[in-house]
Amino acid sequence: MSFRRNGNLSSTLLLIAANVLIPVAIVIFATGFFPYKPLLPGLAQYEPLDGYGEPPEAPFDKLVFMVVDALRSDFVYTTNSGFKFTQSLIRHGAAIPFTAHATSPTVTMPRLKAITTGSVPSFLDVVLNIDEGDESSSLASQDTWLAQMKAKDTGKLVMYGDDTWLKLFPGTFDRADGTTSFFVADFTEVDHNVTRNIPGELRNDDWNTMILHYLGLDHIGHKGGPRSPHMVPKQREMDGIVSQIYKAIETQDHLKSTLFVLCGDHGMNDAGNHGASSPGETSPALLFISPKLKGLQKNQDSPLPDAEDFQFYSTVEQSDLAPTLAALLGFPIPKNNLGVLIADFLSIWPKKADQAYLLHENARQIQTVISAASGTKTFDGALPAESCASPTSDYEQLACEWQGPSNNLMSARVGDDMDSQWALPVVTWLRKAQELMSGMASNYDMSRLILGQITALLAVIFSLSAAIKTVSPTRSLTPLLVISIAYSIMMFASSYVEEEQHFWYLATSTWFGYLTLRGFKRANTTFPAHLLLTAFPVLASLRLLRAWNQTGQKHAGTPDIVKLFIEPHPHFLWLLVGLTYFWTHRQLVYSFHGRIPVPINYPVMTGLVLAAFTFKAAFTLEDAPELVVEFVKSSLLDFTRGASLIARARAVFVGLGLVAMAAMGFILWEMRGAGGNRKRSRRKKGPAEAITTLQHLYTILALTQSRTANIPVFLIFNLLYWFLSSEIDAPDGTGLSTVELGISSLLLQYASFFAMGGSNAISSVDLSNAYNGVSNFNVVLVGILTYVGNWAGPVWWAFGTVVLLGEIWRRDQRQKRLGSGNNGKRGSDEKEEEAEAKQMLEGGQISPFKTYVAVTTLFTAFSVAAVMAACTILRTHLFVWTVFSPKYLYCVAWSLVQHLVINVGLSGLLFWLGSF
Amino acid sequence: MPLVDPVTMSSSAIVKGAVAQSTSTTKSTPGSQATESSTTTAGSSSSLATLRPVQIKQTPAAQTVRHALPAALTALYLLRFDALVTNPVPVMLNALPVVAAFQMTYALLCLPAAGEPASKSNRKPRPGEKKKGGDIGSSTIITALLASVLTSIVTPFLYFAMVLFGAPFLTHGSHTFLCAAHLALLTLFPLFYVHGVDSAAWAAVGGFRAPLDETFGGLVGGIVGAWLGAVPIPLDWDREWQRWPVTILCGAYGGYLLGRVLGGTLFWGKKF
């Protein structure tokens, strides 16, 4: 018997080991997969270049940098654009147009980093983009053209628009007015707040850099896509601002040497979203505007016909902005720049020596970056000829190829007579260096990738053996293994990663089809038609969930229930939303019934639910006003008029916290009383019911953090939950087993995530509820709110599972008591008897919670190992940064937060509280 | 029924024969017997525990048809595949009567009709028996017609089941419905022909307790095949055949044929 006890202990130890190894593997792998790029510290200075004189004189001294968020190239350049004035500038040569290639991830913060530093931001910046308060994403300490303009000390820096700039450059701007983009329904106010500052600033002559960042066009894209009826009017509005600034430059003396740059930070796809790397998303417009540029004689055709690939005029890299601005405005190129001076502007400098200087400075600066990255001093002296015959690394190859361009520069410097194409080899070399340094493939730390992989495989082995030891009979693990293995295989195909929801939908429907129809096994003679009647609502619920939000990549934006039935019928939506809140209210009141007197219970819970509901209504009025019906506006919002959204959200959170504390108080109080006879009647149910209170309180939190159109989904969840609960006490002792519940929970957690609009794309992270009740940015709070906002469904199912696990536990306790009463009848199975004897010796059976953790750990270990293997093997795949890396980040969220924190930590705590 | 309980609970301990015995003792009460139209006419072995695998008739015609028809179905499918990909609805519609004729021939020639003694070859013909195996009498034709009526009744339900498992609901209605009709004709028609509306037999089929044979094997294969047919749809290969419902139909046919052949040969009589 002591051996058996050891068996239980060893399975617990294996389980703990697996759960320790999972985060360890994730961290090791991440450090190898997202390598930390060495950043050169400090501000670049002009260093004397051998043989050159002073740096060439810059044609401009002031900069107006106007960013229009999501300004895709065709919005400016094509026939149906609203930028008529800008197009006339292109025709007259006063505007030099480009298509600036933006690398993935095409979201604002990494793009601004690329634009200002000239470097290619690491993929981790995406995470930091969400986690906007992170200090390490701040560029205040890095070398950027803003820092250089400030160091020039020829004027102040002013900024109006998206407050991402303020977060990236704290303390840099002398005058600033940041706008936030919480509500994408705001098309006008957010831009008006920028525009109203322009006339005054154009009259001021105390600044040398003015940054304007307009968000309205991006909002229109998110809301209505690139063909929204608001799009062209917004373009005309932006065109008007271009005209306003250009005319000021033309007419006002203190602005005559002003360079005006108009650009988008990224583009958008046909659905109006961005984040990935489709041509639409990676092709923003970029224009350099000034009357002085007419001298370049670059008069180009405009407008142009539509282009499928969004490439208009010549295409440059977004990072090329940094060295080009450095040359045009006369400051040293930022230290970590990988951009290449745009050669079209070279002819501004009439002397070849000046042109050579600028190119040479660019090359030398990139060589410094290469030397830092490769850890060698490749460019210090001439390389021995033999090592150039067979270069050992890409870096060496590059160093060898430097000879030719370097000779060209030398000749240009001394004024040799050369053909007009002399600069071409230099630019080609620079592009090559840029490509090499931007491609991160060479930066993987293979040993760490493999170490992480091995650790994850160990976690798989541990969790597998723990599950086999914990679960009996072992064959009940088969469905879980099939799911885990199929999922693991799927991770290697990019389209299955993009369309992961189909896997969960099909698996969930099949599994619930099995659960509802397994009663056929009990039915011996008669055809159990009633089972079909149970199966129908359950499967229909799952079908509704599947169709609620269209997610994934391929068919993103195609009709779904939200678009077809919810948005056109707001009355119907609010009926369902009201029903959801009403139902939660009912359950909340019921779970407190008998604990607190009705006169207190009822008003308190009503107040809490009403606060949550009015917050949701008020939030929707800001976020999606077209969804709010008159009834909700007049009846519910009017009597709480004046309360700000932050105050409303805080009221909800504080109320939830207080009621949760009360519920916890009841649990602890009843736990204490559980020992005495006095509370005997309540002993079985007391804390268990308080746990359901916490479950309902979480439901309110989940509703608060979910999009309004997703709220009715919780009614469907309730129906499925009710089915699972009824299956626990199915007749004939064939009730739901813990493993079956674990599998159901796993499937529903994933299916609900996708059903509520989640996907494996970074762009699908929903930030609309991330700032509820938060006025000052707080990483922890915003992080939690973001997580609950996106994983509302999965966390709901984790709560639900704990309550159901408690029910299973009590059912088994009951059956054990019954079984020990008439052991003779039940003891037909020798094994079972033995197991029972063992359990009695140990004073308890295997806790259902342990079995549940074994189930979720097994799947998590499999998924982590599979995603790592896919990322390692496909690290040179075209989609590694757009499909597999985002999947890795999602996998991290699922395994660290959803598995470890929610399914193990939170559920464990709740199960423990409820088991007294 | 108190006796059911020990049976279900002790399935692993008692050998199968014992289960069968205890079940048949439960079932041999006259009341329950009378309400069922059972697969066999023999009294003591009428209950579910002895639901026998369907045996293909031993006549030369039956044996020829048994092997020829799967080949013919495969050939038909391969011949029409390109047309199916470009124009699924008319192709499925036109193929329906052909497949129906195939299945009808198969049922009439090879399968024992419901109500007919199931496994004559195993036992001596009883004295009261009217027909010899292999004859296509009027009663078997009526059984076949009834089976086809039942198949068409069940097709809408199959359609809804497919929708519940993710088939498009608002679009592609005729695609899915025809696909369901094909699936029903392949997998359910033979079962209706051999079991009729015998609820015990259908409960056994639904509970995956029926022994494998050509009919049940075909059902399992067809449904699993159709289910697996959904797998390649999300792949980004952008092929024409990835369109709804080509892969589903392909899986259904492949699975059905495989299940039918394997169920009739290698796994005949085995249970899950």
Curated annotation (Swiss-Prot), chain B:
Mark out the compositionally biased spans (Low complexity). 32-48
Q: Which domain of life is it from?
A: Eukaryota
The alphabetized list of GO BP terms reads: GPI anchor biosynthetic process
Q: Which UniProt keywords apply?
A: Endoplasmic reticulum, GPI-anchor biosynthesis, Membrane, Transmembrane, Transmembrane helix
* UniProt feature, compositional bias: Polar residues: 21-31
Tell me a Gene Ontology molecular-function term this record carries. mannose-ethanolamine phosphotransferase activity
- Write out the pathway annotation from the protein's UniProt entry: Glycolipid biosynthesis; glycosylphosphatidylinositol-anchor biosynthesis
Q: Where are the transmembrane segments?
A: 91-111, 145-165, 177-197, 215-235, 248-268
Membrane topology per the entry is: Multi-pass membrane protein
Q: Where is the region Disordered?
A: 21-48
**Which is a Gene Ontology cellular component entry for this protein?**
endoplasmic reticulum membrane
- Compartments where found: Endoplasmic reticulum membrane
Q: What does this protein do?
A: Acts in the GPI biosynthetic pathway between GlcNAc-PI synthesis and GPI transfer to protein.
Concerning its family, UniProt says:
Belongs to the PIGF family.
Q: What is this protein called?
A: Glycosylphosphatidylinositol anchor biosynthesis protein 11
Name the source organism.
Neurospora crassa (strain ATCC 24698 / 74-OR23-1A / CBS 708.71 / DSM 1257 / FGSC 987)
